[in-house]
Swiss-Prot record:
Belongs to the RETICULATA family. InterPro entries: RETICULATA-related. Residues 111-132 have a biased composition (Gly residues). It is a multi-pass membrane protein. It is found in: Plastid, Chloroplast membrane. GO terms for cellular component: chloroplast; chloroplast envelope; chloroplast membrane; endoplasmic reticulum; plastid. It comes from Arabidopsis thaliana (Mouse-ear cress). The gene is RE. One of its GO terms (biological process) is leaf development. The keyword Coiled coil does not apply. Disruption phenotype: Pale interveinal phenotype due to marked reduction in the density of mesophyll cells in interveinal regions of leaves. Increased sensitivity to ozone and a virulent strain of the bacterial pathogen Pseudomonas syringae pv. maculicola. Residues 1-47 form a transit peptide. This is Protein RETICULATA, chloroplastic. May play a role in leaf development. Required for leaf mesophyll cell division in the early stages of leaf organogenesis. Acts in a developmental pathway that involves PPT1/CUE1 but does not include ASE2/DOV1.
Length: 432
């Protein structure tokens, strides 16, 4: 307030008054490490021009041993002290703070939001209700993903299987622990016969996506098969009697489409994040840190350690659009370049053949980039959201083939529409 001189003084010792013992203090799972029996807690006093002092103190209940898991509740009490008056402590001035809120206390003793974006479980505003929300969120995560195994438990389970952990998983186990369901899923996948087990052990990108979504490879395979069949049908219908005369264009579209299908599914697939990302100095480091915090797709489900805000989900749509555009342009250069070489060689061999104009290379590649960035990005984001809803349904959890059948059906409809739409875009742009 203007004209009011503020003097902040931090006292080093708190003298606990007898009135505190009459109030119940909520115990939380908070472990005090290497604390002495007496604890010094800072007191914040604010003195205004009116001469009134307003103090905030924090009282720690040390009635239980600090080595016990349930030891020590934490409460915030507020005193209003007038000049020369005794301290007045009212019941309404006591509020419980969870251990997660303890780290987020600001200079006024308030509880801020310590999460990047929205945690979804009591992340905002202070008070006991936020702590209860966190507890409910933790219970749900433990039910859905299993308990967090400590390093000793992780190594015991791993050695029992005769397996070894990758360096990033090993580091995460030492520092944070690993969810039981993720550990068991990895141990099962890495022991798979053939190329799958080798790929899981050697390729972190595939491993992390398979841990988050065991049906990841099924979706890629379904996408490739469906797209190849649908592209053939759509090309025949759209090109009609010119199909065989334009066969090189069909082959180019098919080859590029196969590569693009893998990119489309892979870039939007959820993946497990081990450890905590660290921000590197400089603009590039901040950009990488911000990218790592984004969800894989707009409708990606939140998982332990992954909370996404509405702004992050919106940013994901545009970021994935840029990535899709880059992939489309690159694949267009390669695919259309091969098709143009085939067409040119064919015309040199059979000069009497009715020639069809060779599509412009850069213009065709740009068409692929724009099409993937706008149309494919939007359609596949929606597909991922629909698959998430179906896979999370009780029926699909009891009967997994239902989710797989839905995946085939929705991707079939998407590919039929997308293939016909691309031919229309190509004709309208003059590329084909």
């Amino acid at each position: 307030m203007a004209g009011c001189a503020m003097n902040l003084q931090f006292s080093s010792v708190v003298k606990v008054r007898n009135e505190i013992s009459s109030f119940g203090i909520c115990n939380r799972d908070f472990v005090f490490r290497d604390l002495a029996k007496a604890m010094k807690v800072p007191v914040l006093r604010i003195r205004g021009g009116s001469g009134r002092q307003r103090s905030r103190l924090f009282v720690v209940n040390m009635s239980q041993s600090p080595i016990e898991p349930q030891s020590g509740g934490f409460a915030a009490t507020e005193q209003i002290k007038g000049e020369g008056d005794n301290s007045i402590l009212g019941k309404d001035n006591v509020r419980n703070l969870g251990t997660d809120q303890l780290e987020n206390l600001d200079i006024d003793g308030n509880v801020g939001d310590g999460f990047n974006g929205s945690d979804g479980n009591g992340g905002g505003g202070g008070g006991g209700n936020g702590g209860e929300g966190d507890g409910e969120g933790e219970d749900y995560e433990e039910k859905e993903f299993g308990p967090i195994l400590k390093f000793e438990e992780v190594m015991k389970e791993t050695e029992a299987r005769g397996a070894t952990l990758p360096s990033d998983m090993l580091e995460a186990a030492k520092n944070y622990g690993i969810r039981k369901v993720l550990l068991l899923r990895y141990l099962d996948l890495q022991s798979s016969a053939g190329l799958l087990g080798f790929a899981i052990r050697s390729w972190a990108m595939l491993r992390n996506r398979m841990l988050a979504d065991p049906s990841f490879l099924f979706k890629i395979g379904a996408e490739i098969v469906i797209d190849s069949c649908c592209a053939t049908v759509a090309e025949v219908q759209k090109r009609g009697k010119d199909f065989w005369a334009e066969f090189e264009l069909y082959v180019a579209d098919l080859l590029v489409g196969t590569v693009v299908n893998i990119a489309l599914v892979g870039m939007l697939a959820p993946y497990v994040r081990f450890g905590q990302p660290s921000a590197s100095p400089g603009f590039l480091g901040r950009m990488v840190f911000a990218y790592n915090a984004l969800p894989s797709s707009v409708f990606e489900a939140e998982r332990p350690g992954c909370r996404f805000s509405a702004q992050q989900r919106l940013a994901t749509y545009f970021y994935k659009g840029i990535m899709y555009g880059a992939v489309g342009f690159g694949c267009g250069i390669v695919g259309q370049g091969i098709a143009n070489l085939i067409m040119t060689a064919k015309r040199n061999i059979n000069k009497s053949e009715e020639n069809i104009p060779v599509p412009p290379l850069i213009k065709s590649a740009a068409l692929w980039g724009v099409f993937l960035s706008v149309s494919s990005n939007t359609r596949y984001q929606i597909i991922n959201g629909l698959e998430r809803v179906v896979e999370a349904s009780p029926f699909a959890k009891k009967f997994p083939p239902a989710a797989m059948a839905f995946t085939v059906g929705v991707r079939l409809a998407n590919n039929i529409y997308g293939g016909m739409q691309f031919v229309d875009w190509a004709r309208l742009s003059g590329c084909q």
